[in-house]
Amino acid sequence: MITLDVIKSDGSSKTCTHLKKIIKDHSGKVLIALKLILALLTFFTITITINYIKVENNLQICQSKTESDKEDSPSNTTSVTTKTTLDHDITQYFKRLIQRYTDSVINKDTCWKISRNQCTNITTYKFLCFKPEDSKINSCDRLTDLCRNKSKSAAEAYHTVECHCIYTIEWKCYHHSID
């Protein structure tokens, strides 16, 4: 060993023997400690890199979906589809939601706009829009236009959940039937 040769030729035999013993006794432990530190640093570096790549991929997915929606939409708004049928549970949910946030009961045709967050699978109920009492509108499309244009004769109630990457918007309608 080069180190031992240097020590041997450098000093007295007593000092040399003592230093040889220290190096021999502790060199293995020091190397093991250095290897463990290197392994831990490698593990943390790989973990941080993997998490960074996941976040970057999610961000790119959100951005690409947002950009594709902007390209598909002529007026830089998200695409809108109108649905006229609802199952009973969803209708009941919206009736309760409207009642809670507006202190009113659905007794007329109603439309609401639903935004879906595809990145984290969150559904956001942007706002509810009610047909005016005196209106003769019977079509969901016409009612949707009225709500979308925020006519002064339509009342709005907002219920929003914070989320990111929203790119799908649907309108749903409930037609109140008079029994």
Curated annotation (Swiss-Prot):
Residues modified by glycosylation: N76, N121, N149
Residue spans, topological domain Virion surface: 51-179
One of the record's GO cellular component terms: virion membrane
Chief location category: virion
Topological domains, Intravirion: 1-29
Keyword Membrane listed: yes
Keyword Glycoprotein: yes
Biological process according to GO: proton transmembrane transport
Subcellular compartments: Virion membrane; Host cell membrane
Membrane topology: Single-pass type II membrane protein
Keywords assigned by UniProt, alphabetized: Glycoprotein, Host cell membrane, Host membrane, Hydrogen ion transport, Ion transport, Membrane, Phosphoprotein, Signal-anchor, Transmembrane, Transmembrane helix, Transport, Virion
Transmembrane feature ranges: 30-50
Family statement: Belongs to the metapneumovirus small hydrophobic protein family.
Assembly behavior: Homooligomer. Interacts with glycoprotein G.
Function: Viroporin that forms a ion channel probably displaying low ion selectivity. Plays a role in counteracting host innate immunity by inhibiting TLR7/MyD88/TRAF6 signaling and STAT1 phosphorylation, leading to down-regulation of type-I IFN.
Protein name: Small hydrophobic protein
Organism: Human metapneumovirus (strain CAN97-83) (HMPV)
Name of the coding gene: SH
